[in-house]
Amino acid sequence: MLHKIEKWIDQTNFEYKQQRICCAKFFSEFEGFYPLAFLEQAYFVVVDEIPKPDFPELRQMGFGSFMDMQAGGITYKDTYNVSSLRLHFHELVHVAQWAHLGAHGFILRYMDEIQTFGYHESPLEKMAYALDANFSEGGAKINIPSYVVRNI
């Protein structure tokens, strides 16, 4: 299943490759949180509908509600898809998580957390929401990729 999901992710990222925008454009907004070198290796695509791998096997494993959830963004490796520009900070946390855990590590952990805790209580999501809240509320600047490595 992991290989099927990763193949779908790679195909999805390939299909949007021409529309990808480099996140380095956010360096001044996110300075102190995300190093320029990290942002230069992260991309986003603004889409009308968030792409998800709607495989019957995922539904059989209990991911139906996650698949049907109206998400504002989702991250696949170094690229995230957003329906709103507001979600960049949150999705960049997930880019850092993917980079640290690797494709299989992230997919396995994310699936396990969704099944065990549900979306809103999953540790990877809670980390992203907490860091996003810190940024939105003008909190202390934190090097996000380093924070992810230390706290994941």
Set out the residue ranges of the language-model regions.
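A short, surface-exposed helix-loop junction/capping segment
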Residues: L2-Y16
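Auxiliary, metal-adjacent structural segments of Zn-dependent hydrolase domains
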Residues: K17-I74, D78, A130
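Hydrophobic (often cysteine-bearing) scaffold residues that line and stabilize catalytic clefts
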Residues: C22, F26, L85, H120, ...
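Sec/Tat-exported extracytoplasmic proteins
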Residues: Y34, H100, D132-F135, G139
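Post-HEXXH active-site segment of zinc metalloproteases
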Residues: M69, W98-A130, S146
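Active-site recognition of the HExxH zinc-binding catalytic motif
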Residues: R86, H90-W98
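Long, well-structured alpha-helical subdomains associated
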Residues: G138-I152
